[in-house]
Amino acid sequence: MNKYEIIANEMRNRIKNNVYPIDQPIPDEVSLAKEFNSSRMTMKRALDNLVAEGLLFRKRGHGTFIIQSAIQDDHVHVVSNEILGLTNLLKDKKIKSKVIQFEVQFPTEEVAAHLSIDQKTPVYYVVRLRIVEGEPYVLEKTYMPTHLIPGINDDVLHDSIYNHITNVLQLKIAGTHRKIRACKSDHIDQQHLGCKQDDPILEVEHVGFLDTGIPFEYSFSRHRHDKFVVTSVNIRR
């Protein structure tokens, strides 16, 4: 984990544990950089992450403030540029993964097109139920090219795929393209997510790509409506 990520995690915990008063600016970058024994640039990058997450906002000439509505609740909050994966997004929660299906297959025309591969290139097909603090949160269906993301196995699937990609394979995840839509729950959602027949589902269609610009993941995540929030923060300068 990079220094700025360690600092961002600590600052995130401080914000959510009310270490800093919400009606006053947090300590300035110079003071925080000195406290964390880091450069000001590293400190700025850490705070930039928290601004992007919707926890902080900067007011020119006045400092950096906590956004009061960003206090922790029981939902998964995803901001527009979030590419961490659920395990990293909810570090302070107990997360389990139940692997429902895992196999290598040849992609359909649609899957191949989203991954920029041909239909003769094998992909992992993974269906996982993500359980947070004992409650089912999201049902994930994921496709990844086997040649691009080698080494996926049961151990990885029960831990974090993104940690495997970044820490083991040393690949850099550069970005993501998402489409978010409301859907009716189907019998599979009802079976695994514990939702009712009339409950809506928030589906996220996702294409992730590496810093080379190559897509490495095409997935669909089916979220319980009561456990998922998309956060967009716009600050008037």
Curated annotation (Swiss-Prot):
HTH gntR-type domain segment(s): 1-69
Classification via InterPro entries: Bact_HTH_transcr_reg (IPR050679), Chorismate_lyase_/UTRA_dom_sf (IPR028978), Tscrpt_reg_HTH_GntR (IPR000524), UTRA (IPR011663), WH-like_DNA-bd_sf (IPR036388), WH_DNA-bd_sf (IPR036390)
Transcription regulation keyword on record: yes
Induction info: Up-regulated by konjac glucomannan and by cellobiose and mannobiose, the possible degradation products of glucomannan. Repressed by glucose via the carbon catabolite repression system.
Taxonomic superkingdom: Bacteria
UniProt keyword terms in alphabetical order: Cytoplasm, DNA-binding, Repressor, Transcription, Transcription regulation
Segments of the chain annotated as binding DNA: 29-48
Cellular localisation: Cytoplasm
Classification via Pfam families: GntR, UTRA
GO biological process, one term: negative regulation of DNA-templated transcription
General function of this protein: Transcriptional repressor of the gmuBACDREFG operon which is involved in the uptake and degradation of glucomannan.
PANTHER family, per the entry: HTH-TYPE TRANSCRIPTIONAL REGULATOR GMUR, MANNOSYL-D-GLYCERATE TRANSPORT/METABOLISM SYSTEM REPRESSOR MNGR-RELATED
Protein name: HTH-type transcriptional regulator GmuR
